[in-house]
């Protein structure tokens, strides 16, 4: 459950380390984002050698949340951290690698590139 002002780890090699959510995309009344939802983020910390700088605004997709996500079979899945993957304006990935597991719900939300690059899909 991600909302405005939530800090997330970055799960790709774009150069950003931590981002802060500044808007949840998907309607005027949408307050919370879950796995597979698109958000607008501001980069709060970045590695010096990366191609993205601190203060940059970018779109991202949520890949892990601490709040559990209910699946259709009745099971729940939750992760140890909140994490996102940065996107370019045309919904292409900014990085070329993804670290850590991602949720299977990304496949249903049409983020196949994220699923294919992830080392583990839960």
Curated annotation (Swiss-Prot):
Keyword Ribosomal protein carried by entry: yes
Any matching Pfam family: Ribosomal_L14
Domain of life: Bacteria
PROSITE patterns according to UniProt: RIBOSOMAL_L14
Annotated keywords: Ribonucleoprotein, Ribosomal protein, RNA-binding, rRNA-binding
GO MF annotations in UniProt: large ribosomal subunit rRNA binding; structural constituent of ribosome
Function: Binds to 23S rRNA. Forms part of two intersubunit bridges in the 70S ribosome.
NCBIfam families associated with the record: rplN_bact
Protein name: Large ribosomal subunit protein uL14
Taxonomic placement: Bacteria, Pseudomonadati, Bacteroidota, Cytophagia, Cytophagales
């Amino acid at each position: 459950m991600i909302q405005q002002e939530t800090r997330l780890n970055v799960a790709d090699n774009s150069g950003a380390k931590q981002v802060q959510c500044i808007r949840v995309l998907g309607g005027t009344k949408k307050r919370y984002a879950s796995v597979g939802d698109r958000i607008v983020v501001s980069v709060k910390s970045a590695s010096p050698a990366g191609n993205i700088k601190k203060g940059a605004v970018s779109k991202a997709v949520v890949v892990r949340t601490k709040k559990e996500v209910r699946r259709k079979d009745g099971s729940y899945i939750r992760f140890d951290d909140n994490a996102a993957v940065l996107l370019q304006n045309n919904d292409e990935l900014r990085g070329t690698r993804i670290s850590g597991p991602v949720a299977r719900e990304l496949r249903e939300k049409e983020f196949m590139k994220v699923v294919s690059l992830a080392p583990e899909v839960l």
